């Protein structure tokens, strides 16, 4: 069990099943998918394909998506790394999950999670030109988080940038 605050009793609920025929010896094969709630027909899925969700990176070191209408960037870094798109730059010193909301305006928020529950400090360096012309650093301290290990922390970027 990774969550020590919930019941130890098994809980079940249908989520979804996804399968791919990878062939016998796939090498460096790639694919991408998004999970969209509430889509129950091929017609609705065809409409969603024209959606504002963009897959910007899908590698063994990071997965980055952006919802252009909602102004949300979601980023999973599997190790230390840097993502750049246009003038936006995000660097992390270790594995983490990030979400940047409203990155185009003064109400921007940064959410940081440590899904590996390492209870360490994660350093995030940001350059978001719409908010500030300077690169800024966020130190997110997950040490001593105990039963809340893995929970995300939120930062108002106007207070940092």
Give residue spans per PLM region:
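Non-catalytic terminal regions with compositionally biased, polar/charged low complexity
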Residues: 36-161
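Exposed beta-sheet edge/beta-hairpin loop segments within beta-rich domains
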Residues: 13-27
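Short, flexible coil/linker segments at or flanking structured domains
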Residues: 6-8, 21, 53
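Short, well-ordered loop/turn elements at secondary-structure boundaries
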Residues: 27-29, 106
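Trp/Gly-enriched beta-strand surface patches
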Residues: 1-17, 83-91, 123
